[in-house]
Amino acid sequence: MIFCVVVVGVPLVWAIYLSLTDASGGSLSGHFIGFQNFTDAWHDQNFRNALENTVIITFASQAIVVVGAAILSHHLVRDFRGKWFVRLLVILPWAAPVALVTIVWLWILDSLLSVLSWTLGKMHLLGAVCGAFGVHGCSAANPPPWLGHPKLAMFSIIVVQAWRILPFAVIIFIAGRASIPSEVDDAARIDGATALKKLWYVDLPLQLPIALVAVLFGIVFTAVDFAVVYLLTHGGPFNSTQVLPTWAYAVGIDSGSLGAGAAISLFLFPLLVLVTILMLFFARRAQVS
């Protein structure tokens, strides 16, 4: 209890205090200005872009995560040779430090030495993928700037975020599948249900509550993430990939406006609380006994 108060409570209260003042760099106090920082942030176009990017990246990545976790868990619960090794490979992105794996992605998405560009080029898909984002003329000799073009940079961040959260969701889905009584599977097979029908009419409805839990954690982890966007693009190019955590850092730390930065960071708090309440509500409604 004391640990939670010190680690969570004190910083939160201090951030709320700073958001109501005009505190700047070099000082942890300032004059009380009420909700002026929140009003200024809301009318700032850069803030609105960061908020929009946060929502897009969060929900787009979670859509990929849910589909990927459902497919992977469906196969990983079966018995096959090397099952433990495949599970190890799946969980590695979650176990590795975020900064480390993001630096690896920097190499994968490098504008000159990109292994992704090389792979897509060998598959003759590079031009089609780039064209889907309005970038034309891409080839092995002219690789795309994955992190230098606004649309490609957003797409890259969504993929990295989904890849990072996917292992956690897979673990939750596997646990959910393990909780399904064997009698249910036996009854479905006796009724002649195909694998696809069993997945759609039996497995997914029974896993819905735990899937909502996975989505909830994924939304929270992605929305508050700072490292991926900061290390990949620093919010660029031209602030096109700024999210609320990186924009709060840019305003509060880089620009020295501690009060304004604290206000920006606190915008996420009520949104995440609302998402949590809604997800738990629907999880309870969808629970199957």
Segments predicted by a language model, with ranges:
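A structural signal for multi-pass alpha-helical bundles of membrane permease subunits
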Residues: 1-289
